[in-house]
Curated annotation (Swiss-Prot):
The protein, known as: Glutamyl-Q tRNA(Asp) synthetase
Gene3D superfamilies associated with the record: HUPs
Enzyme class: ligase
Enzyme Commission number(s): 6.1.1.-
Organism name: Dechloromonas aromatica (strain RCB)
Stretches of the chain forming a coiled coil according to its record: none
GO biological process: glutamyl-tRNA aminoacylation; tRNA modification
PANTHER family listed in its UniProt record: GLUTAMATE--TRNA LIGASE, GLUTAMYL-Q TRNA(ASP) SYNTHETASE
Function: Catalyzes the tRNA-independent activation of glutamate in presence of ATP and the subsequent transfer of glutamate onto a tRNA(Asp). Glutamate is transferred on the 2-amino-5-(4,5-dihydroxy-2-cyclopenten-1-yl) moiety of the queuosine in the wobble position of the QUC anticodon.
Keywords: Aminoacyl-tRNA synthetase, ATP-binding, Ligase, Metal-binding, Nucleotide-binding, Zinc
Residues noted as binding Zn(2+) in the record, renumbered to the chain: 100, 102, 122, 126
Lineage: Bacteria, Pseudomonadati, Pseudomonadota, Betaproteobacteria, Rhodocyclales
GO MF, one annotated term: ATP binding
Gene Ontology CC: one annotated term: cytosol
Pfam family, one: tRNA-synt_1c
Length: 301
Protein backbone atom coordinates (compact mmCIF):
# COMPACT_ATOMS: atom_id res chain seq x y z
CA UNK A 1 0.00 0.00 0.00
CA UNK A 2 1.70 3.17 -1.20
CA UNK A 3 -0.66 5.72 0.39
CA UNK A 4 -0.90 6.11 4.18
CA UNK A 5 -3.29 3.58 5.71
CA UNK A 6 -6.86 4.84 5.96
CA UNK A 7 -9.43 2.46 7.37
CA UNK A 8 -12.92 2.67 8.78
CA UNK A 9 -15.59 1.11 10.97
CA UNK A 10 -19.07 1.37 9.50
CA UNK A 11 -21.90 0.14 11.73
CA UNK A 12 -25.57 0.34 10.83
CA UNK A 13 -27.68 2.12 13.49
CA UNK A 14 -30.29 -0.62 13.72
CA UNK A 15 -29.60 -1.25 17.40
CA UNK A 16 -26.82 -1.16 20.00
CA UNK A 17 -23.35 -2.57 19.45
CA UNK A 18 -22.88 -6.21 20.43
CA UNK A 19 -19.87 -8.49 20.70
CA UNK A 20 -19.80 -9.20 16.97
CA UNK A 21 -19.67 -5.47 16.27
CA UNK A 22 -16.86 -5.10 18.80
CA UNK A 23 -14.76 -7.77 17.07
CA UNK A 24 -14.98 -5.86 13.78
CA UNK A 25 -14.23 -2.54 15.48
CA UNK A 26 -11.23 -3.90 17.41
CA UNK A 27 -9.77 -5.67 14.38
CA UNK A 28 -10.09 -2.68 12.07
CA UNK A 29 -8.90 -0.22 14.73
CA UNK A 30 -5.74 -2.09 15.66
CA UNK A 31 -4.88 -2.91 12.06
CA UNK A 32 -4.98 0.82 11.34
CA UNK A 33 -3.26 2.11 14.47
CA UNK A 34 -0.41 -0.40 14.48
CA UNK A 35 0.41 0.70 10.92
CA UNK A 36 0.32 4.38 11.81
CA UNK A 37 -2.94 4.78 9.94
CA UNK A 38 -6.18 6.66 10.33
CA UNK A 39 -9.44 5.09 11.48
CA UNK A 40 -12.74 6.69 10.53
CA UNK A 41 -16.29 5.99 11.68
CA UNK A 42 -19.17 5.97 9.21
CA UNK A 43 -22.85 5.41 10.01
CA UNK A 44 -24.29 3.17 7.32
CA UNK A 45 -27.82 4.47 7.72
CA UNK A 46 -28.70 4.50 4.01
CA UNK A 47 -31.51 1.98 4.62
CA UNK A 48 -33.54 4.54 6.54
CA UNK A 49 -36.59 2.36 7.41
CA UNK A 50 -34.31 0.03 9.40
CA UNK A 51 -32.71 2.78 11.48
CA UNK A 52 -33.60 2.86 15.17
CA UNK A 53 -33.99 6.37 16.65
CA UNK A 54 -31.09 7.14 18.97
CA UNK A 55 -29.05 4.10 17.91
CA UNK A 56 -26.35 6.12 16.11
CA UNK A 57 -25.70 8.27 19.18
CA UNK A 58 -25.69 5.18 21.39
CA UNK A 59 -23.11 3.51 19.12
CA UNK A 60 -20.82 6.54 19.29
CA UNK A 61 -21.15 6.76 23.09
CA UNK A 62 -20.28 3.07 23.37
CA UNK A 63 -17.24 3.39 21.12
CA UNK A 64 -16.06 6.36 23.16
CA UNK A 65 -16.63 4.56 26.46
CA UNK A 66 -14.61 1.59 25.18
CA UNK A 67 -11.68 3.88 24.37
CA UNK A 68 -11.88 4.06 20.57
CA UNK A 69 -10.52 7.31 19.13
CA UNK A 70 -11.62 8.01 15.57
CA UNK A 71 -10.23 10.52 13.10
CA UNK A 72 -12.33 13.32 11.66
CA UNK A 73 -16.10 13.76 11.76
CA UNK A 74 -18.51 10.84 11.56
CA UNK A 75 -19.99 10.42 8.08
CA UNK A 76 -23.72 9.67 7.81
CA UNK A 77 -24.89 7.97 4.63
CA UNK A 78 -28.35 9.45 5.07
CA UNK A 79 -26.80 12.83 4.25
CA UNK A 80 -25.06 11.58 1.10
CA UNK A 81 -27.98 10.89 -1.24
CA UNK A 82 -26.87 13.57 -3.72
CA UNK A 83 -23.49 11.88 -4.12
CA UNK A 84 -25.15 8.51 -4.74
CA UNK A 85 -27.47 10.03 -7.34
CA UNK A 86 -24.48 11.56 -9.13
CA UNK A 87 -22.75 8.17 -9.25
CA UNK A 88 -25.89 6.60 -10.71
CA UNK A 89 -26.03 9.29 -13.39
CA UNK A 90 -22.44 8.53 -14.37
CA UNK A 91 -23.26 4.85 -14.72
CA UNK A 92 -26.39 5.60 -16.76
CA UNK A 93 -24.45 7.84 -19.12
CA UNK A 94 -21.89 5.07 -19.59
CA UNK A 95 -24.63 2.58 -20.48
CA UNK A 96 -23.86 0.43 -17.46
CA UNK A 97 -27.18 0.87 -15.65
CA UNK A 98 -30.67 -0.12 -16.72
CA UNK A 99 -34.20 0.01 -15.36
CA UNK A 100 -35.77 -3.21 -14.12
CA UNK A 101 -39.53 -3.78 -13.89
CA UNK A 102 -39.36 -7.19 -12.22
CA UNK A 103 -41.14 -7.84 -8.94
CA UNK A 104 -39.70 -10.26 -6.42
CA UNK A 105 -42.30 -12.83 -7.43
CA UNK A 106 -41.40 -12.48 -11.11
CA UNK A 107 -37.73 -12.98 -10.31
CA UNK A 108 -38.56 -16.01 -8.17
CA UNK A 109 -40.62 -17.48 -11.00
CA UNK A 110 -37.95 -16.97 -13.66
CA UNK A 111 -34.65 -17.41 -11.78
CA UNK A 112 -32.84 -20.64 -12.54
CA UNK A 113 -30.51 -20.84 -9.53
CA UNK A 114 -29.61 -19.30 -6.21
CA UNK A 115 -27.19 -16.42 -5.85
CA UNK A 116 -23.97 -16.85 -3.94
CA UNK A 117 -25.29 -14.82 -1.01
CA UNK A 118 -28.44 -16.87 -0.57
CA UNK A 119 -30.92 -14.91 -2.68
CA UNK A 120 -31.71 -15.58 -6.33
CA UNK A 121 -29.40 -14.79 -9.21
CA UNK A 122 -31.11 -12.22 -11.42
CA UNK A 123 -31.89 -13.88 -14.80
CA UNK A 124 -31.45 -10.69 -16.85
CA UNK A 125 -35.11 -10.31 -17.81
CA UNK A 126 -34.92 -6.53 -18.36
CA UNK A 127 -31.32 -6.32 -19.53
CA UNK A 128 -32.33 -5.79 -23.15
CA UNK A 129 -35.07 -3.29 -22.33
CA UNK A 130 -38.28 -3.03 -20.34
CA UNK A 131 -41.20 -5.21 -21.41
CA UNK A 132 -43.95 -3.32 -23.23
CA UNK A 133 -46.14 -1.29 -20.90
CA UNK A 134 -43.85 -1.75 -17.89
CA UNK A 135 -42.00 0.92 -15.91
CA UNK A 136 -38.69 0.65 -14.09
CA UNK A 137 -39.01 -0.30 -10.43
CA UNK A 138 -35.31 -0.58 -9.66
CA UNK A 139 -32.01 0.17 -11.37
CA UNK A 140 -29.46 -2.57 -11.98
CA UNK A 141 -25.75 -2.54 -12.82
CA UNK A 142 -24.62 -4.69 -15.73
CA UNK A 143 -22.03 -7.36 -14.97
CA UNK A 144 -20.29 -9.82 -17.26
CA UNK A 145 -19.49 -13.51 -17.33
CA UNK A 146 -15.82 -13.05 -16.49
CA UNK A 147 -14.16 -13.69 -13.16
CA UNK A 148 -13.93 -10.96 -10.54
CA UNK A 149 -11.25 -11.93 -8.02
CA UNK A 150 -9.17 -10.48 -5.21
CA UNK A 151 -6.77 -11.68 -2.53
CA UNK A 152 -8.18 -11.28 0.95
CA UNK A 153 -5.54 -10.85 3.63
CA UNK A 154 -7.24 -13.49 5.78
CA UNK A 155 -9.49 -15.58 3.56
CA UNK A 156 -7.10 -15.92 0.62
CA UNK A 157 -8.17 -15.79 -3.01
CA UNK A 158 -11.87 -15.07 -3.51
CA UNK A 159 -13.39 -15.24 -6.99
CA UNK A 160 -16.89 -14.92 -8.41
CA UNK A 161 -18.39 -15.03 -11.88
CA UNK A 162 -20.86 -12.24 -11.21
CA UNK A 163 -23.19 -12.92 -14.12
CA UNK A 164 -23.78 -16.46 -12.84
CA UNK A 165 -23.23 -16.02 -9.11
CA UNK A 166 -25.30 -12.86 -8.62
CA UNK A 167 -26.58 -11.45 -11.89
CA UNK A 168 -26.95 -7.76 -12.65
CA UNK A 169 -27.43 -6.27 -9.20
CA UNK A 170 -29.58 -3.46 -7.82
CA UNK A 171 -28.09 -0.04 -7.08
CA UNK A 172 -31.39 1.78 -6.56
CA UNK A 173 -34.24 -0.15 -5.04
CA UNK A 174 -37.88 -0.24 -6.02
CA UNK A 175 -38.71 1.87 -2.94
CA UNK A 176 -36.38 4.60 -4.19
CA UNK A 177 -33.64 3.99 -1.65
CA UNK A 178 -30.02 3.63 -2.72
CA UNK A 179 -28.57 0.16 -2.27
CA UNK A 180 -25.83 -0.59 0.24
CA UNK A 181 -23.44 -1.71 -2.50
CA UNK A 182 -23.58 1.73 -4.13
CA UNK A 183 -23.35 3.73 -0.91
CA UNK A 184 -20.37 1.84 0.50
CA UNK A 185 -18.35 2.09 -2.71
CA UNK A 186 -19.04 5.80 -3.23
CA UNK A 187 -18.26 6.63 0.40
CA UNK A 188 -15.06 4.58 0.54
CA UNK A 189 -13.80 6.49 -2.49
CA UNK A 190 -14.93 9.89 -1.20
CA UNK A 191 -13.30 9.32 2.21
CA UNK A 192 -10.07 8.01 0.70
CA UNK A 193 -10.41 4.61 2.36
CA UNK A 194 -7.76 2.20 1.09
CA UNK A 195 -7.97 -0.67 3.61
CA UNK A 196 -11.14 -2.44 4.71
CA UNK A 197 -11.17 -4.78 7.72
CA UNK A 198 -14.65 -6.11 8.46
CA UNK A 199 -16.62 -9.27 9.16
CA UNK A 200 -16.62 -12.23 6.79
CA UNK A 201 -20.40 -11.94 6.46
CA UNK A 202 -19.60 -9.26 3.86
CA UNK A 203 -17.10 -11.39 1.95
CA UNK A 204 -19.62 -12.38 -0.74
CA UNK A 205 -20.44 -8.70 -1.38
CA UNK A 206 -16.85 -7.73 -2.07
CA UNK A 207 -16.59 -8.82 -5.75
CA UNK A 208 -19.68 -6.70 -6.51
CA UNK A 209 -18.06 -3.75 -4.79
CA UNK A 210 -14.83 -4.27 -6.74
CA UNK A 211 -16.82 -4.44 -10.00
CA UNK A 212 -18.57 -1.19 -9.13
CA UNK A 213 -15.27 0.46 -8.19
CA UNK A 214 -13.96 -0.42 -11.64
CA UNK A 215 -17.10 0.86 -13.35
CA UNK A 216 -16.75 4.22 -11.57
CA UNK A 217 -13.00 4.45 -12.09
CA UNK A 218 -12.19 4.28 -8.38
CA UNK A 219 -9.04 2.85 -6.87
CA UNK A 220 -9.37 -0.68 -5.53
CA UNK A 221 -8.85 -1.37 -1.83
CA UNK A 222 -7.20 -4.05 0.25
CA UNK A 223 -9.55 -6.30 2.20
CA UNK A 224 -9.36 -8.46 5.30
CA UNK A 225 -12.50 -10.29 6.36
CA UNK A 226 -12.44 -11.25 10.03
CA UNK A 227 -14.17 -14.35 11.38
CA UNK A 228 -17.76 -13.70 12.36
CA UNK A 229 -18.89 -14.42 15.91
CA UNK A 230 -21.83 -16.83 15.98
CA UNK A 231 -24.05 -18.22 18.71
CA UNK A 232 -23.98 -21.95 19.52
CA UNK A 233 -26.68 -22.50 16.87
CA UNK A 234 -24.32 -21.16 14.21
CA UNK A 235 -26.21 -17.89 13.75
CA UNK A 236 -24.26 -14.66 13.32
CA UNK A 237 -24.65 -12.36 16.31
CA UNK A 238 -27.14 -9.67 15.34
CA UNK A 239 -30.24 -7.85 16.46
CA UNK A 240 -32.29 -10.56 14.73
CA UNK A 241 -30.60 -13.31 16.76
CA UNK A 242 -31.03 -11.29 19.97
CA UNK A 243 -27.36 -10.56 20.52
CA UNK A 244 -26.76 -8.92 23.88
CA UNK A 245 -25.80 -5.24 23.84
CA UNK A 246 -22.32 -4.34 25.04
CA UNK A 247 -22.07 -3.07 28.60
CA UNK A 248 -19.78 -0.07 29.05
CA UNK A 249 -19.26 -1.20 32.65
CA UNK A 250 -17.46 -4.27 31.29
CA UNK A 251 -15.37 -2.49 28.66
CA UNK A 252 -12.02 -4.00 29.65
CA UNK A 253 -13.43 -7.52 29.92
CA UNK A 254 -15.20 -7.28 26.56
CA UNK A 255 -12.07 -5.91 24.88
CA UNK A 256 -10.02 -8.81 26.25
CA UNK A 257 -12.69 -11.22 25.03
CA UNK A 258 -12.62 -9.66 21.54
CA UNK A 259 -8.82 -9.79 21.40
CA UNK A 260 -8.81 -13.45 22.39
CA UNK A 261 -11.46 -14.16 19.76
CA UNK A 262 -9.06 -12.59 17.27
CA UNK A 263 -6.24 -14.91 18.32
CA UNK A 264 -4.32 -12.49 20.52
CA UNK A 265 -2.65 -13.81 23.69
CA UNK A 266 -3.83 -11.02 25.93
CA UNK A 267 -3.36 -11.67 29.68
CA UNK A 268 -6.67 -12.50 31.32
CA UNK A 269 -5.79 -10.26 34.28
CA UNK A 270 -6.30 -7.19 32.09
CA UNK A 271 -10.02 -7.99 31.98
CA UNK A 272 -10.25 -6.85 35.59
CA UNK A 273 -8.55 -3.50 34.97
CA UNK A 274 -9.14 -0.43 32.85
CA UNK A 275 -9.86 -0.37 29.13
CA UNK A 276 -6.86 1.94 28.66
CA UNK A 277 -4.55 -0.81 29.92
CA UNK A 278 -6.01 -3.28 27.43
CA UNK A 279 -5.42 -0.82 24.58
CA UNK A 280 -1.86 -0.20 25.77
CA UNK A 281 -1.16 -3.94 25.67
CA UNK A 282 -2.85 -4.35 22.28
CA UNK A 283 -0.91 -1.46 20.77
CA UNK A 284 2.34 -3.22 21.61
CA UNK A 285 1.37 -6.83 20.95
CA UNK A 286 -1.27 -6.87 18.18
CA UNK A 287 -0.33 -9.56 15.65
CA UNK A 288 -2.41 -9.71 12.49
CA UNK A 289 -0.93 -13.09 11.57
CA UNK A 290 -2.51 -14.58 14.71
CA UNK A 291 -6.07 -13.75 13.58
CA UNK A 292 -7.94 -16.99 12.73
CA UNK A 293 -8.44 -17.62 9.02
CA UNK A 294 -11.88 -19.19 9.26
CA UNK A 295 -14.96 -17.20 8.35
CA UNK A 296 -17.08 -18.09 11.40
CA UNK A 297 -16.35 -19.03 15.00
CA UNK A 298 -18.95 -20.40 17.40
CA UNK A 299 -19.05 -18.81 20.82
CA UNK A 300 -19.44 -21.13 23.81
CA UNK A 301 -22.90 -21.44 25.31
Amino acid sequence: MNSPYRGRFAPSPTGPLHFGSLVAAVGSYLDARTQGGEWLVRMEDVDTPRNVPGAADDILRTLDAFGFEWDGPVLYQSKRFEAYAEALDRLKQAGLLYGCACSRKEIADSATHAAIDGGLAYPGTCRGGLPAGRQARAWRLRVDAGETAFIDRLQGRVAQHLEHDVGDFVLRRADGLFAYQLAVVVDDAWQGINAVVRGADLLASTPRQIWLQRCLGYLELTYAHLPVAANPAGEKLSKQTRAQALSVDRAAAELVRALRFLGQGVPEALARGAAADVWAWAGEHWTFDAVPRQSLILLPA
